[in-house]
């Protein structure tokens, strides 16, 4: 039987949120892999359908985070909710002062998301320092997700891109729960 990442599954993290059942399993899986690989206080960003930001301490406390619309959802909203804006391919344009609508939309979507990322990460770092006593310079920022490569060159706060973070986290959770699953079967 498949292993479902849900409440009760061993992760090695201590979930410090109001209702742990509300935390998406993808966020937990990414946090498990990042905490396993890096023993620093962490901010894990997943550039997927939504862009999620998660804070994890070096002791494995999952503190919570922020959820923003992903770049593709934002592009879809512009196309579907405006009268004349076209569908655009997601590409990093060369300029922010754009001479046409398509490049203007691409600029707003990509550079806007880069700015959102920098702002949220900076705010989370400040909270980790002020509310949790973490050393600002020790906080490592890990990014993953299909759209991470698109923003990596423009987002200075990202320390490393981990393309396999979710898969690595699933393997780690499977290993932590393997013996428990054998007893049930």
Task: Give names to the regions the model predicted.
Residues 1-43, 59-185:
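Nucleotide/phosphate-binding catalytic cleft detector across ATP-hydrolyzing
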Residues 44, 51-56:
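Short beta-strand scaffold segments in enzyme catalytic cores
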């Amino acid at each position: 039987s498949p292993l479902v990442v849900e409440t009760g599954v061993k992760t090695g993290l201590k979930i410090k949120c109001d209702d742990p059942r509300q935390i998406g399993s993808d966020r937990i899986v990414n946090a498990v892999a990042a905490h396993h690989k890096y023993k620093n206080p962490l901010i894990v960003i997943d550039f997927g359908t939504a862009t999620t930001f998660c804070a994890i301490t070096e002791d494995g406390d999952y503190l919570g985070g922020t959820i923003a619309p992903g770049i593709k959802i934002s592009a879809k909203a512009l196309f579907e909710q405006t009268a004349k804006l076209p569908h655009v391919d997601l590409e990093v344009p060369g300029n922010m002062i754009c001479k046409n609508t398509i490049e203007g939309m691409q600029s707003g979507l990509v550079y806007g998301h880069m700015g959102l990322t920098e702002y949220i990460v900076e705010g989370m770092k400040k909270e980790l320092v002020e509310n949790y006593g973490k050393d600002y310079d020790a906080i490592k920022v890990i990014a993953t997700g299909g759209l991470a490569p698109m923003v990596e060159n423009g987002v200075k706060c990202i320390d490393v891109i981990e393309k396999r973070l979710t898969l690595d986290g699933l393997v780690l959770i499977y290993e932590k729960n393997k013996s428990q699953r054998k007893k049930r079967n």
